Amino acid sequence: MTENISNEKPRLVNAGQGFSILNTVNYKGRFLYSKYSPDKAVVAAVSRLQVLPQTLVVICSPCLWYGLNELCALLPESCSIIALEADDALLELAEDSLLDQTQKLRVKLFSLNEPQKINEYLLQNTSSGNFKRAIRIDFSAGVSFS
């Protein structure tokens, strides 16, 4: 049983709430979003953010990127977004789910298994004083697998 869970791939499950076309993710025996309103919690968390100019926003476990449009809409132009994923299967899901070209230009997605790439990006962008602060936001329950 444990071996089956460790080899499991993330599975998209229709939330099935009215006319909603949103999915949730079932992975390693748990849902990473609500089964009924998958985007509700992360959109609410984003709406509560107070983001100042020159902030680096760190998205943890982006999975299906619910909340990204809302986040991009509230960010000052001087802010940047990076997304981090520790689990390889969830990283692949996040890469496949980030379809919008505008979003791809705004967000840099990194695997936590490649710290040198994260370090290079941060050194390149912090040395010129681009960021004065950072905030973290968890986009899914996938953070529990890191």
Model feature map: region roles:
Residues M1-S146:
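N-terminal donor/sugar-recognition subdomains of glycan-related enzymes
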